[in-house]
Amino acid sequence: MGWIRDRRSPSSMEIRELHNRDVINRGAFKSRQKRTQTLITSKCGENPSPFFLARSIAIAMGIRFIVMVMIYSGMIINLLFNQEAPSPLKESYCGPCPKNWICYRNSCYQFSNESKTWLQSQASCRSQNSSLLKIYSREDQDFFKLVKSYHWMGLVQIPTNRSWQWEDGSILSPNQITMVEMQNGSCAVYGSSFKGYTENCLTLNTYICMKRTV
């Protein structure tokens, strides 16, 4: 008859029991899977791979290098900006000079374009509280390379012994300049290469005035 239940069909109670059993099995599987993942992670943490170690060491060394570079850069910058300027040597000191005069070491120089006799040139320099050029030493050779023509300097020859004397009364030293006799004369012009040339004192020449700053 149609209303008689088929014994092979599962009852509702059996269906619920199967469903509960399936839920329990799924929960147990997920729990085992989670424990497995946790175990794998813990093992990886306990025994890291060589690649992981190498990468970690490389990163640490890179960070250390950057920090060291920043520290040394800061030290160098601080040293450069805070370094005291060296005090100038006395021999290189150059004080104030009059307008249109050239300052070199401890002296001021004026190169005149006027041509005068030796006495006229001397008077012109004295009117400016200076004297005709005097060579103190060959250490000034770089400066006197600028001299390209003949100029009167403060050097005259003493008739009695024919020695050369500067305006201030000091005797010419071989370490200052070398005298070259060109013609009869008791005055001298400066040429170049630390050489002085005898000249007639009445000859017209340009001249160089100088004054010490110290």
Swiss-Prot record:
Tissue: Detected in peripheral blood leukocytes, macrophages, monocytes and natural killer cells.
GO biological process terms, semicolon-separated: adaptive immune response; cell differentiation; innate immune response; positive regulation of natural killer cell mediated cytotoxicity
InterPro entries: C-type_lectin-like (IPR001304), C-type_lectin-like/link_sf (IPR016186), CTDL_fold (IPR016187), NKG2D (IPR042169), NKR-like_CTLD (IPR033992)
GO molecular function: carbohydrate binding; signaling receptor activity
Coiled coil: none
Pfam families recorded: Lectin_C (PF00059)
Ranges facing Extracellular side: 78-214
Covalent S-S links between cysteines: C94-C103, C97-C108, C125-C209, C187-C201
Localization, UniProt: Cell membrane
Cytoplasmic side stretches: 1-56
Membrane topology per record: Single-pass type II membrane protein
Chief localization: membrane
Keywords per UniProt: Adaptive immunity, Cell membrane, Differentiation, Disulfide bond, Glycoprotein, Immunity, Innate immunity, Lectin, Membrane, Receptor, Signal-anchor, Transmembrane, Transmembrane helix
Domain of life: Eukaryota
C-type lectin domain location: 98-210
Gene Ontology cellular-component terms listed: cell surface; external side of plasma membrane
PROSITE patterns for the chain: C_TYPE_LECTIN_2
Residues modified by glycosylation: N113, N129, N161, N184
Residues spanning the membrane: 57-77
Subunit structure of this chain's protein: Homodimer; disulfide-linked. Heterohexamer composed of two subunits of KLRK1 and four subunits of HCST/DAP10. Interacts (via transmembrane domain) with HCST/DAP10 (via transmembrane domain); the interaction is required for KLRK1 NK cell surface and induces NK cell-mediated cytotoxicity. Can form disulfide-bonded heterodimer with CD94. Interacts with CEACAM1; recruits PTPN6 that dephosphorylates VAV1.
Protein's job: Functions as an activating and costimulatory receptor involved in immunosurveillance upon binding to various cellular stress-inducible ligands displayed at the surface of autologous tumor cells and virus-infected cells. Provides both stimulatory and costimulatory innate immune responses on activated killer (NK) cells, leading to cytotoxic activity. Acts as a costimulatory receptor for T-cell receptor (TCR) in CD8(+) T-cell-mediated adaptive immune responses by amplifying T-cell activation. Stimulates perforin-mediated elimination of ligand-expressing tumor cells.
Something else known: Is not capable of signal transduction by itself, but operates through the adapter protein HCST.
Annotated PANTHER family: NKG2-D TYPE II INTEGRAL MEMBRANE PROTEIN
Protein name, UniProt field: NKG2-D type II integral membrane protein
